From Swiss-Prot:
Family in the record: Belongs to the UPF0175 family.
Phylogenetic classification of the source organism: Bacteria, Bacillati, Cyanobacteriota, Cyanophyceae, Synechococcales
Organism: Synechocystis sp. (strain ATCC 27184 / PCC 6803 / Kazusa)
Protein name: UPF0175 protein ssl1255
Signal sequence bounds: none
InterPro entries given in the database record: UPF0175, UPF0175_domain
PANTHER family: UPF0175 PROTEIN SSL1255 (PTHR37525:SF1)
Length: 89
């Protein structure tokens, strides 16, 4: 709730969902996380955690959907640390 009112989110689901016979709980959590991130209700790290995805994997998913990645200095530092931990940087 925000200021005593329930929070409203809008989900823009991809057209491919019409072609999928089974859409499980993980799929719904991923779509909700994307929507919350895109509407700046949660951080990139939180969205990737909700999606049960690595941050870099979640960033790639956002990029594939044309969603801009917005994050603060702390999240940038976390990304750099993540890359260093994997010896990618």
């Amino acid at each position: 709730m925000v200021d005593g009112r329930p929070m409203q989110i809008t989900l823009n689901l991809p057209d491919r969902l019409n072609q999928i016979g089974e859409f499980d709980q993980n799929d719904w959590l991923r779509e909700i996380a994307i929507a919350l991130f895109e509407q700046e209700h949660i951080s990139l790290a939180r969205a990737s955690k909700i999606s049960s995805m690595e941050i870099m994997e979640f960033q790639k998913l956002l990029s594939d959907r044309g969603i801009c990645i917005h994050y603060d200095v702390e999240e940038l530092a976390q990304d750099i640390q993540h890359l260093q931990n994997r010896s990618w940087l």
